[in-house]
């Protein structure tokens, strides 16, 4: 565990007072089961605690970061951030995969690279950090490790581009956004609409769809993908 302690100190300025607690956070059930006579604790209870504090802190962040997003969108984004694959990625970023104690069978079967095990260890670490320090230290760690990727948009599943474009453009105040139909083609029962989105009278994106609403979404998507620099 000394190497892990060095990583935590050098990269995150974290020093555990309770070294046994830290070791437990990285002990998988398979390792504990293979050493039953030693009565070694595994990390499942810490995982339970870490999951709870992670949900709380990510929820708080999203609530404050996106004041106009509805509950459903916030829940979807949170689910993307705290899902197994995402947490496993964060664990690898922190080099946690190197320090998990696994049983021999689990090790041979590739457990060290398994997202489930890595994600669980990441949550267990958060639980241990909460017990050894406090929620403020957990928040500091999350903001250092997780939030930069969230703010880079790695977990966004954008379905409402009109709302997303509006949020991007109105960060610093109200901006006049308007959608207008450029053309309509095809028979009445099968029309195709071409729409452009304008900001302060300037066209910043165009889209096409079989309804005005779909075409507007495509126009907004086109504007978002161009980047904000082209919108102002």
Swiss-Prot record:
Kindly list the places in or outside the cell where this protein is found, as annotated in its UniProt entry: Cytoplasm
Q: Where is the DRBM domain?
A: 160-229
What domain of life is recorded for the organism?
A: Bacteria
Q: Name one Pfam family in it.
A: dsrm
The record places the active site at 51, 123
The record's SMART domains line, in alphabetical order, gives: DSRM (SM00358), RIBOc (SM00535)
By its UniProt entry, which PROSITE patterns does this protein fall under?
DS_RBD (PS50137), RNASE_3_1 (PS00517), RNASE_3_2 (PS50142)
Q: What protein name applies here?
A: Ribonuclease 3
């Amino acid at each position: 565990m000394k190497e892990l302690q060095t990583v935590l100190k050098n990269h995150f300025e974290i020093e555990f007072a309770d070294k046994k607690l830290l070791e437990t956070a990285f002990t998988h059930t398979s390792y504990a089961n293979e050493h039953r006579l030693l009565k070694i604790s595994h990390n499942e209870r810490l995982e339970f605690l870490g999951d709870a504090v992670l949900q709380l802190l990510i929820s708080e962040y999203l609530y404050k970061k996106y004041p106009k997003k509805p509950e459903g969108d916030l829940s979807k984004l949170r689910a993307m951030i705290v899902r197994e694959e995402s947490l496993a990625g964060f664990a690898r970023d922190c080099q946690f995969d190197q320090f998990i104690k696994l049983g021999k069978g689990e090790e041979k079967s590739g457990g060290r690279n398994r997202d489930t095990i890595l994600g669980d260890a990441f949550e267990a670490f958060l639980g241990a950090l909460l017990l050894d320090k406090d929620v403020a230290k957990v928040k500091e760690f999350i903001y250092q490790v997780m939030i930069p990727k969230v703010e880079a948009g790695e977990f966004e599943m954008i379905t409402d581009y009109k709302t997303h474009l509006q949020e991007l453009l109105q960060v610093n105040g109200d901006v006049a956004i308007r959608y207008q139909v450029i053309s309509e083609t095809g028979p009445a029962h099968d029309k195709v609409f071409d729409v452009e989105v304008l900001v302060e009278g300037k066209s910043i994106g165009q889209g096409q769809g079989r309804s005005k609403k779909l075409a507007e979404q495509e126009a907004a998507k086109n504007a978002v993908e161009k980047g904000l620099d082209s919108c102002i």
